[in-house]
């Protein structure tokens, strides 16, 4: 387990797949998140995926040092399918009182530093699927900051890049044989229903109007949008120095 040395409002700890969390600690993680996110069905999310803590390859937990409560989580898994390698951001939650703070940004930076160190570099492709426009907006902002990075779906493009569409279909097929993709919108019909249909009480809006409009127009309460950022060859030094420093 690795800790973030900058300890002010919270502590960050990273664990790899080799960890073995006691059942009581896993229950504490879920209970603390549910208490801190009372309008979200955290119990359903983890209850529908009982082996999820054993499945994550990478896990960051944010803890409030005062009460020793879990206040944030980012869990991910490495996937390899043929020549395609990608990092799937599986779970991302921050309790209500830390919304609009630096916590989520710090979790992401710390997480990517640890993944890069453990894996000998960042993956060429970072993936999530989400009902939340804020998550897509994070991918959009990340791709805009990294020279040569490619975003999918690109809401500013008249049509999606054909090779990114092919990649997106491979990714969805790798994640689940039961899911399908609408290639032009990035929509995965039923994606949220397959995970936790009652998790979100509502659709939160991001700071980007185009992103919000896309989600409102295409995403129902049972659906998700696939989000992908492909890094260009040679992007690693820039990401290390400018993004996850």
Q: For each of these PLM feature ranges, what is it?
A:
Residues 37-41, 67-71, 104-108, 203-209:
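A short linear-motif detector with a strong N-terminal bias
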Residues 83, 101, 136:
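Loop/helix-junction capping segments adjacent to catalytic residues or to phosphate/diphosphate-binding pockets
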Residues 86, 100-103, 119-121:
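Short, solvent-exposed secondary-structure capping/transition elements
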């Amino acid at each position: 387990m690795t800790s973030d040395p900058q300890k002010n409002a919270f502590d960050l700890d990273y664990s790899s797949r080799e960890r073995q969390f006691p059942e009581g600690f896993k229950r504490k993680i879920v209970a603390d998140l549910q208490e801190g996110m009372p309008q979200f069905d955290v119990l359903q999310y983890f209850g529908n995926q009982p082996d999820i803590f054993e499945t994550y390859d990478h896990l960051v937990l944010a803890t409030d040092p005062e009460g020793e409560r879990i206040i944030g989580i980012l869990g991910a898994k490495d996937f390899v399918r043929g020549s395609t390698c990608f990092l799937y951001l599986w779970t991302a939650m921050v309790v209500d009182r830390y919304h609009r703070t630096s916590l989520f940004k710090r979790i992401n930076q710390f997480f990517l530093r640890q993944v890069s160190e453990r894996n000998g570099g960042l993956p060429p492709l970072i993936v999530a699927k989400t009902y939340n426009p804020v998550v897509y907006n994070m991918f959009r902002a990340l791709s805009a900051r990294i020279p040569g990075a490619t975003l999918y779906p690109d809401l500013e493009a008249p049509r999606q890049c054909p090779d990114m569409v092919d990649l997106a279909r491979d990714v969805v097929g790798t994640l689940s044989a039961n899911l399908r993709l609408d290639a032009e919108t990035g929509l995965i019909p039923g994606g949220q229903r397959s995970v936790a249909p009652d998790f979100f009480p509502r659709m939160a809006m991001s700071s980007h109007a185009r992103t919000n409009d896309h989600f409102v127009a295409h995403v129902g309460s049972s659906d998700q949008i696939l989000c992908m950022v492909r890094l260009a060859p040679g992007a690693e030094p820039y990401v290390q120095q400018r993004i996850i420093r």
